[in-house]
Amino acid sequence: MAIRKYKPTTPGRRGSSVADFAEITRSTPEKSLLRPLPKHGGRNNAGRITTRHIGGGHKRQYRVIDFKRNDKDGVLATVAHIEYDPNRTARIALLHFIDGSKRYIIAPNKLKQGDKIESGPQADIKPGNNLPLRNIPTGTVIHAIELRPGGGAKMGRSAGASVRLVAKDGPYAQLRLPSGEIRNVDARCRATIGEVGNAEQSNINWGKAGRMRWKGVRPTVRGVAMNPVDHPHGGGEGKTSGGRHPVSPWGQKEGRTRHINKPSDKLIVRRRNAGKKRK
């Protein structure tokens, strides 16, 4: 993938860029793998906003992705197409299996149309093949990793993501995540070889607010720019600093919000941001 930059023909085009989509081989998705994807605008069944900054955007259909890949062991598949997916930053690959079935998977880097891939403990170590962690050599770069055996891939799914298998210790495999965290994962869990493609996605400059609206992202308004009825930082004559420590719209003090002492914490060998003081 490469980034195509625009000339500053308008203020919105100045500095903006777009993916060149050179790796895409088909513009229409596989109909049998599409599902409806209604929009809710960040609202619950009572009509109240539960997630801010969501609304509008282009209509989408959900592409059903096979994150488990555990029911086609030993069945050879051919990469029929590399496609765009509006629901994720990564590209997706359409597989045609020799038994006639079709599946979508996350497209790893260097996977191309016509490649042969498979899953199972005996699969070769090459991009796109899916194996249990205990069958993958130490030092291999992987993605689409399960956290529980048979639970489907949960980690390493976004564009450019890569996780390294650094060690194996009894029933566990040690993984170095993109955040820097080193974590134990059950060695029976599956992962796919290679890193996720479309790595230049993070370098795209969206250029104008309208492009984010096309993506379904609404504006993020500062609390100090609101009225007192809308936010604890709102109001005041002229520009103000908010007059208090930063808080959320509901009065919760800013800072880290992740719960500590989760049951899964015992699987963390080295935390991300190790040594950083928690607030």
Curated annotation (Swiss-Prot):
Compositionally biased spans, kind Basic residues: 269-279
Keywords from the UniProt entry: Ribonucleoprotein, Ribosomal protein, RNA-binding, rRNA-binding
Gene3D superfamilies recorded: 2.30.30.30, Nucleic acid-binding proteins, Ribosomal protein L2, domain 3
Superkingdom classification of source: Bacteria
SMART domains noted in UniProt: Ribosomal_L2, Ribosomal_L2_C
One Gene Ontology CC term in the entry: large ribosomal subunit
Family matches, as InterPro entries: NA-bd_OB-fold, Rib_uL2_dom2, Ribosomal_uL2, Ribosomal_uL2_bac/org-type, Ribosomal_uL2_C, Ribosomal_uL2_CS, Ribosomal_uL2_dom3, Ribosomal_uL2_RNA-bd_dom
GO terms (BP aspect): cytoplasmic translation
Compositionally biased residues, Basic and acidic residues: 253-268
One of the Pfam families matching this protein, by short name: Ribosomal_L2_C
A GO term, aspect molecular function: transferase activity
Annotated region described as Disordered, given as residue ranges: 32-53, 225-279
Family statement drawn from the similarity comment of this UniProt entry: Belongs to the universal ribosomal protein uL2 family.
Physiological role: One of the primary rRNA binding proteins. Required for association of the 30S and 50S subunits to form the 70S ribosome, for tRNA binding and peptide bond formation. It has been suggested to have peptidyltransferase activity; this is somewhat controversial. Makes several contacts with the 16S rRNA in the 70S ribosome.
Subunit structure of this chain's protein: Part of the 50S ribosomal subunit. Forms a bridge to the 30S subunit in the 70S ribosome.
UniProt protein name: Large ribosomal subunit protein uL2
Organism taxonomic ancestry: Bacteria, Bacillati, Actinomycetota, Actinomycetes, Micrococcales
Gene name, Swiss-Prot/TrEMBL: rplB
